[in-house]
From Swiss-Prot:
Transmembrane segments: none annotated. Zn(2+) 1 binds at D140, E175, H453. Detected exclusively in kidney. It comes from Mus musculus (Mouse). Zn(2+) 2 binds at H107, D140, D203. Pfam families: M20_dimer, Peptidase_M20. This is Beta-Ala-His dipeptidase. Its EC number is 3.4.13.20.
Length: 492
């Protein structure tokens, strides 16, 4: 896989990373200590976000990168306050036309976290317990961003020429919807991204605790609300119960018409757009190393709907799913309040798979709910709205950087990676692919039990350090495998 010269350099790179792993962990501790929460619209936290982006910019400049901090202006909040948006960092290290250029995307903002949410440690004090580094942002996404930086800094420390040109795009609002990112990518398409050959994202997890993975697809997401309204005020059930169409009863019937107890979506035509299953895809599922019992235990689930690995993965990745999320306007507090809500709003979403279109799904959902509501002969008013429509994403697993990543994983970890999709929605992958027309790859570092977004988020020291080695080796292998520009395309 690697020439003798490259093998010798790899040994030096890996040895340096091992020797300096405590320094790398200390840097992660410093980054985790910054409460860069983008979700809560609080001036103090916005200041923390600016502090985080400035720290990252300094880190990149110390590597010798040219860094541009893009001012994004301010954000008007529903309560009338105006909050500054943290800048997006565009950084560049090397511009040799003989080398491929790889751009790394990451985010430095985090979800909210407090000790009394159920954390065993202070979420903003990186704490190591049995090789696990606990802290908010450790795996999502500060750890992977630093692992990439660690790889670059190792070449620098050993006075070795980087085999690829490196670019960074780092944002601070991913957890709040990546405000202004798509517009920036569009604006920079013919500038910052013009020389980019490959884009790497490391913002998801492996399927297991020990076996690495490469991700080649994510599901899209259509988020809906359905409102049923009689009037703005609530009713007393003793005064009005039995003499009107209750909005809650209508809404429960509507939500109950969407999906059955086996997870099958009941909306007519919803499966018609789905890409057919290929033999190559079936083989991929068979080759994935997954223990169903372990997966159930890790996720604290007594039993899933499906008994085989292949069925479970297909329903998680390549079949659409429908989830009901909640009801606004309903009484949900302790006690025995006998109110009839005058207006209720149901919320549900459908995860899309290739080659489903949000606009088609919106039409199908609306027609289905209107038909169900019509049969109830209710005097209430119903309104359906799709508030979010995000496309699914797939990559070409046979393009240069995927082949390079597979070989690199074999070198660093000694095993071939699981080729996986992600059942969630990561819009940035589709945004990069659609706008830049470059090869986009998701190369995760974290284990399945890292707990991103939840209490006790962590990244294993082993994943963090081996991930730093992985990225360093990837630079060498990508340089070797690079054979000109390849347009990303659907894997199926």
């Amino acid at each position: 896989m690697f020439s003798s010269a490259h093998s010798g350099l790899l040994e030096k790179l890996f040895h340096y990373i091992d020797l300096h792993q405590d320094e790398f962990v200390q840097t992660l501790k410093e980054w985790v200590a910054i409460e860069s929460d983008s979700v809560q619209p609080v001036p103090r936290l916005r200041q923390k976000l600016f502090q985080m982006m400035a720290l990252a910019a300094d880190k990149l400049r110390n590597l010798g990168a040219g860094v541009e901090s893009i001012d994004l202006g301010s954000q008007q909040m529903p309560d009338g306050q105006s909050l500054p948006i943290p800048p997006i960092l565009l950084a560049e290290l090397g511009s040799d036309p003989e080398k491929p250029t790889v751009c790394f995307y990451g985010h430095l903002d985090v979800q909210p976290a407090q000790k009394d949410d159920g954390w065993l440690t202070d979420p903003y004090t990186l704490t190591e317990v049995d090789g696990k580094l606990y802290g908010r942002g450790a795996t999502d996404n500060k750890g992977p961003v630093l692992a990439w930086i660690n790889a670059v800094s190792t070449f620098r420390a050993l006075q070795q020429d980087l085999p690829v040109n490196i670019k960074f795009i780092l944002e601070g609002m991913e957890e709040a919807g990546s405000i202004a990112l798509e517009e920036l990518v569009m604006r920079e398409k013919d500038h910052f991204f013009s020389s980019v050959d490959y884009i790497v994202i490391s913002d998801n997890l492996w399927l297991s605790q020990r076996k690495p993975a490469l991700t080649y697809g994510t599901r899209g997401n259509c988020y809906f609300t359905v409102e049923v309204k009689c009037r703005d005020q609530d009713f007393h059930s003793g005064t009005f119960g039995g003499i009107l169409n209750e909005p809650m009863a209508d809404l429960v019937a509507l939500l109950g018409s969407l999906v059955d107890s086996s997870g099958h979506i009941l909306i007519p035509g919803i499966y018609d757009q789905m890409a057919p299953i290929t033999e190559g895809e079936k083989t991929m599922y068979k080759n994935i190393d997954m223990d169903l019992e372990e997966y159930q235990n890790i996720n604290q689930v007594e039993k899933f709907l499906f008994d085989t690995k292949e069925e479970l993965l297909m329903h998680l990745w390549r079949y659409p799913s429908l989830s009901i999320h909640g009801i606004e306007g309903a009484f949900d507090e302790p006690g025995t309040k006998t109110v009839i809500p005058g207006r209720v709003l149901g919320k549900f979403s459908i995860r899309l798979v290739p080659t489903m279109s949000p606009s088609v799904v919106e039409k199908q959902v609306t027609q289905h709910l209107e038909a169900v509501f019509s049969k109830r002969n209710s005097f209430n008013k119903m309104a359906v709205s799709m508030v979010l429509g995000l496309h699914p994403w797939t990559a070409n697993v046979n393009d240069t950087q995927y082949l390079a990543a597979q070989r690199t994983i074999k070198t660093v970890f000694g095993v071939n990676p699981d080729m996986i999709r992600d059942g969630s929605t990561i819009p940035i992958a589709k945004i990069f692919q659609a706008i830049t027309q470059k090869s986009v790859m998701m190369l995760p570092l974290g284990a399945v039990d890292d707990g991103e977004h939840s209490q006790n988020e962590k990244i294993n020291r082993w994943n963090y350090i081996q991930g730093s080695k992985l990225f360093a080796a990837f630079f060498l292998e990508l340089s070797k495998q690079h054979s000109g520009h390849q347009m990303p395309s659907s894997v199926y």
